[in-house]
Amino acid sequence: MTQQEVFDLLNGSLIDKQIGYDDLWEFCRSHGLEMFSGETRYCIISKDWDFVLKISRFDNVRDDYNAIEFANYENACKLGIEKIFLKMWKFGTLDCGLDIYAQVRYSFSHSNIDNKKERKMRKQTDKIRSCKIYRKSHENAYDGYRISNEWYARAYQIYGKQFMRKFERFTRDKRIGDLHDSNVGYLGKMPIILDFAGYHG
């Protein structure tokens, strides 16, 4: 199925912006698609796609978290820190007014590196953890949630101090406070964040 065919299929089937879980689940089941649901969004995937469709939920939250996340991505691009965020784009707007977004398909992985590199990495990670800027940003940035020390130190090591300072300011300014291990991972060897809308209650 091409992206246009997917869009046309959604446009012909989803006629209400306030789409409910059961209706979307039935739509996905009848078209051989998989659906996953979080607190603020639905995700639709197909084994043939290299992207994931994201549809905002309005049944239990009032904010459009996809629009917030997309705006965050565009702002990250302007600041030059987009490489730490999983790429996303606007897929289209359905006739009912519902905006659909897409994100690169992502398989969660821990970085698989050999033992010698792992030992070297651990030494570097320990060194980074002792840095004042690391301790300060890691302790204060995330509103009670925790990214693993390994992920944060790895990001610090790969992207550098200036980049991570910019990143920390950005997450604070945009209220991206729910950065925890379910929202971060690795794409290849690169630390990335796949959910960066924040949670606003």
Describe each region flagged by the PLM.
Residues 45-46, 55, 102-105, 186:
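Conserved hydrophobic "DFG−1" position in protein kinase catalytic cores
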Residues 80-160:
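Conserved structural core of kinase catalytic domains
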Residues 2-49:
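ATP-binding glycine-rich phosphate-binding loop
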Residues 31, 37-82, 86:
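ATP-binding glycine-rich loop module of kinase domains
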Residues 51, 84, 101, 175, ...:
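Protein kinase-like catalytic core scaffold
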Residues 169-201:
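Catalytic activation segment of kinase domains across protein kinase-like and atypical kinase folds
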